[in-house]
UniProtKB/Swiss-Prot annotation:
Stated name of the protein: Thiamine thiazole synthase
Subunit note: Homooctamer; tetramer of dimers.
Protein family membership: Belongs to the THI4 family.
Pfam family, one: Thi4
Length: 261
């Protein structure tokens, strides 16, 4: 070994193509597809994958974590309350107690999504960025997977047909947009699905409604995180994230209960 790096262009391309082909062949038929790699989606992915179920997370942007990175108005911290702090501690995330507030903790807004994403990956989940879910597969009155497209192709406005991923269950964890549910409602008006959207901010109400609003809203389709509050007209919360993590965990537990029967 003379210390010279090998960098053959063709070998690089072949390596990427072979690896990508094998990856796609492994994930075109899975147990759960999670749409959106924000706080609730990553949490759900971690708990589902830990139990050995094939889980794929699809994120339109090139980074995961949703709005966590920006903290509160760009300040690099978020707030988490008990008992959601246990979910972050499991991922090795450092938490600081808030003086005078026994139930509240602050966490670094960069460390949280980074470590939570790694925890989901280490558990066995596959996270794909730059992929947008443009439609759902609807068979015999049940969601049976997702229709996917490159986000770059969508942004360019090119008319190129999509591909699909089959799944037993789909989770909409796309945040305020609730985009998967919106798509189902828009394309299938006969189903009578409506998405009223979230209400204005009331942090305590919003936090406490998140787990209650986390549920299966159509056969095979679950909502968690802010998508759950958007679907059920719940309040928004701001830079407090405990409800998001608890919602993701509850969503995973609900699906696990069905799949483990």
């Amino acid at each position: 070994m003379d210390g010279k790096l090998r960098a053959d262009e063709v070998a690089v391309t072949k390596s990427i193509l072979k690896s990508t082909f094998n990856m796609w062949m492994d994930i075109i038929d899975v147990d759960v597809v999670i749409v959106g790699a924000g706080p609730s989606g990553l949490t759900a992915a971690k708990y589902l994958a830990q139990k050995g179920f094939k889980t794929v997370v699809l994120e339109r942007h090139l980074s995961f974590g949703g709005g966590t990175w920006g903290g509160g108005m760009g300040f690099p911290n978020i707030v988490v309350e008990k008992p959601a702090d246990d979910i972050l501690r499991e991922a090795g995330i450092k938490l600081d107690e808030v003086d005078g507030e026994e139930e509240l903790f602050t966490a670094d807004s960069v460390e949280v999504p980074a470590k939570l994403g790694v925890a989901a990956i280490d558990a066995g989940a596959k996270i794909l960025t730059g992929i947008v879910v443009e439609d759902l597969i609807l068979k015999e009155d049940k969601i049976a997977g997702v229709v996917i497209q490159s986000y770059a192709i969508e942004k360019a406005g090119l008319h190129i047909d999509p591909l699909t991923i089959s799944a037993k269950y789909v989770i909409d964890s796309t945040g305020h947009d609730a985009s998967a549910v919106h798509t189902l409602a828009r394309k299938n008006k006969d189903l009578g699905i409506e998405v009223p959207g979230e209400k204005s901010m009331w942090a305590e109400k919003g936090e406490n409604s998140l787990t209650r609003n986390t549920r299966e809203i159509f056969p095979g389709l679950y909502v968690c995180g802010m998508a759950a509050n958007a679907y059920h007209a719940g309040y928004r919360m701001g830079a407090i994230f405990g409800g998001m993590y608890l919602s993701g965990k509850k969503c995973a537990e609900m699906i696990l209960e069905k799949m483990e029967k």
